[in-house]
Amino acid sequence: MQRDGITVRLLQDLEDIRTSWSLMQQLRTNHSDEESYLQQVERQRRNTGYNLVGALGSDGQLLGLAGFVYSEMLSRGRYLYVDDLVIAEGHRSQGIGGVLISWLRTHARNFGCSSLHLDCSNHRLDSHRFYRREGLEDRSLHFVLDL
């Protein structure tokens, strides 16, 4: 998909995933090195069907990234869950996030999903505003018990 000079495509080979490391670090700081990140992505791809989709500028630079899975629950039916969504610092508020959400929405419909879900940390107020502008609604709280 291409829109507003942004090309959106699945990142599937090892080099694509390796290229995503520095951008994903802006969101997920728990991996201290590229190798542990690559291993985690591969494990998630194998175990949960995790996918990465990238938004690339006209020069091929990775400007945005989303990680997602398909899932199904009695309460929701089949849905697409966005686990990671990050836009490169310096490129935020330029429509790239909207292009990714649009791609994810279309992709979810094409795969028979009835909804798109994501969690967002309480302190990410700018992200909350963005998601609301994109049509997502606050519908639940997410509770956690660290073990």
How would you describe each model-predicted region?
Residues 2-6, 10-77, 102, 146:
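Acetyl-CoA-dependent GNAT
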Residues 108-119:
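Conserved GNAT acetyl-CoA-binding A-motif
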Residues 98, 122-141, 145:
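Conserved active-site alpha-helix within GNAT-family acetyltransferase domains
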Residues 87, 93-106, 133:
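Conserved acetyl-CoA-binding loop-helix of GNAT-fold acetyltransferases
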Residues 53, 64-66, 80, 85, ...:
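Conserved GNAT-family N-acetyltransferase fold
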Residues 72-82, 92, 138-139:
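A conserved beta-turn-beta hairpin within the catalytic core of GNAT-like acetyltransferases
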Residues 88, 121:
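Residue-level recognition of the GNAT/N-acetyltransferase active site
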